Amino acid sequence: MTNLFQDDSLTLHTDLYQLNMMKAYFDDGLHERRSVFEVFFRDMPFDSGFVVFAGLERIIHYMQNLRFTETDIAYLHDELGFDGPFLEYLRNFKFKGNILAAKEGEFVFKTEPVLQVEASLAEAQLIETALLNIVNFQTLIATKAARIRSVIDDETFAEFGTRRAQEMDAAIWGTRAAYIGGCDSTSNVRAGKIFGIPVSGTMAHAMVQAYRDELEAFRSYAKTHFDSIFLVDTYDTLKSGVPNAIKVAKEMGDKINFIGIRLDSGDMAFLSKKARQMLDEAGFTEAKIFASSDLDEHTILSLKAQKAKIDSWGVGTKLITAYDQPALGAVYKMAAIADENDILQDSIKLSSNTEKVSTPGKKKVYRIITNEDGLKAEGDYIALADESLENVDKLTMFHPVHTYIMKTVENFTARELLVPIFQNGELVYDMPSLDEIKAYKEENLALLWDEYKRTVRPEQYPVDLSVKCWKNKMRNIEKVRKSVQLHSPVELDMPF
């Protein structure tokens, strides 16, 4: 059988058109021209009021191993027809650029850069696909997990989605993202080993079915597991499962730690109330009721509204697949490119869809934090790279489209969201531990007003442009429109 994975190179984890463009740049002598690209998304996933940035650790691993292997070169030559000096360039390829990004666990919002690449045109083009692949998936899962965490308060929350994930890599990295977003543990043993995430799990229906009866299965499980949670819905939750769990717990006494029971089907609100009553009457008032089965933040909110007696939640399919919105839609757009004198010139992408018009120029993003009612974020402020908010005492923030919507902020702190990750191709960022990332996410959560954290119809968090950045965008739009009109061979009557 052919070895499908001859090496562990991810460098060809890119779209063909990236290589096609690199070849054209190389042939025209443009491949070393300095450029700036930025990653952002246009819409808030799940109609959420916030998004949790994730994926940076995998980006770092990817960038540190970015090189074309001999098997890569052979494939590009034999199968795709690349040859000559271009292949030699790829053989000696090394990323020498700069990458800035939001920290993992940072709350980010639509239209603002969450990652910025400044590198040669060829370098920046090659890494687009992988960067978007990583950010789009992990940020989506971290956000979904954070939304689930927001509705269950301090109750425990386990990630149970491995078998429903879109393949093994998605399960592993999705688990990590879910942990950043708010889950307490995972059923995925490999993810526990790799990342140090606490692992949790009970039993499956198959174990109950494998024994003569449910009672025997529970007894067997209790003999081998001091911490016992019994799955009670294989046959009949209230007539069989819960009574048998209680019976085994009483039989075993101090020989086990009877943690509780798990419900995996049926009317969770009704069954949890009845099961709680039965456990309490049997003297197991401390026993917990765990729930699983196609849960998400909406189902959990509904169960809580029905006063379900559930203490812990196992969330699988709808978390690990981001079931209700399986794509974030982050894009990677050129913001600037150097001229013949290596001076960066603005670059803009226009569209008849106004939300798809990019904001030109190399930029920075500030989070504006005031001391009103404790530290609170007033909004994010996108400025051009040469702007600074040092020694600025009063800041006017206005909506970038509806410019009459504005406010003035005083006594604020401005924190830059994008921090250096790679400089001149070298890693300069100290990657925090996963628990530190998770704690950072919780710190950031406290900065948001409750109105932005609502699960349903949250208030829209302000993301504004500086006056200079806004004027620069308008100037570039007009410049491109005039250029198109001047050089277009076709005359069109535009509706605006």
Where are these regions (language model features)?
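Gly/Ser/Thr/Ala-enriched C-terminal appendages of enzymes
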Residues: T2-R33, F37, D47-S48, L295-F496
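Buried, small/hydrophobic-residue-enriched core segments of structured protein domains
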Residues: T2-S35, D43-P45, G81, L87-K96, ...
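N-terminal, Lys/Arg-enriched amphipathic/low-complexity engagement segments
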Residues: S35-R91
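Short amphipathic alpha-helical segments
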Residues: G55-R58, L140, S433-I437
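Short coil/turn segments at secondary-structure boundaries
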Residues: A74-Y75, T143-R147, G161, K453-Q460
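Short acidic, Pro/Gly- and aromatic-enriched capping/linker segments at domain boundaries
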Residues: I99-G105, F412-L417
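Hydrophobic residues within beta-strands of alpha/beta enzymes
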Residues: S200, I261, I289, D311-W313
